[in-house]
Amino acid sequence: RAFENSQTIYTPAVHPREPYITQREMFVSPFYEREKELGGHFENEVAGWERALAYISNREKLDKYIKEVPVRENEWDTRHVPYDVANAEHLAMSDSVGMINLSHFPIMDIKGPDAERMLEYLSVAKVGGNTPEGKVIYTNFLDEDGGVHADLTISRISNDSYRVVTGGADGNRDWVTLRNYRDDNGLNADINIRTHDIATLGLWGPKAVEALGNFINPNEIDIENFPFVSAKNLTLNLSGLSLIHISEPTRLAS
């Protein structure tokens, strides 16, 4: 990897999406083999995780959406990603429902007497105090100068327990921020990295609730029992399922 990175500095300019050749398939999700069967386009990875940017099996969606897909006139602008298929996938998801593998999103469970104090200091939004259990808070971490350091969601699991979900490439940086603040201030809080223990899928689109209702009790996920920015635990085929209602009408399942 060091050699590959050096080529982007000491040789002529390379494409910003030029894929790495070395150290591939370091981390893959439980859905990886199925994604490959669907023609997943895995040229690029994120923080060591293989991530499909589109699925060739969805090329047929271009029949419906081709007129809405932007034309990229330069070859350089179409390299390494099948943008036409990816655009059609997004348009189809906006009309109906789509599922995105987000297993590369870092997950950290934070628990302890000082968990609230630590997250309250680092977060812009209020995550402690009278914030109810099961509430999901979208927030930023700020640096000492007030600049945005991280963009993430925090779920309050119990009085002294939280789950932090951050961006795909930002997990180590945000973990270091949390660890350093805890250790520098002598706080009592356990930071448990769960990324490799939990598979995560995002369900997006106006028919997301309808689709999910085919597998679990629809009453469990209606707007009254599962409001916006809330989290709850359910069971799907005897497997534990952690649901987050993060946007409307979206469901995030881990």
Across the structure, where does each feature detected by a protein language model lie?
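Glycine/proline-enriched, intrinsically flexible loops and inter-domain linkers
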Residues: R1-L243, S247, R251
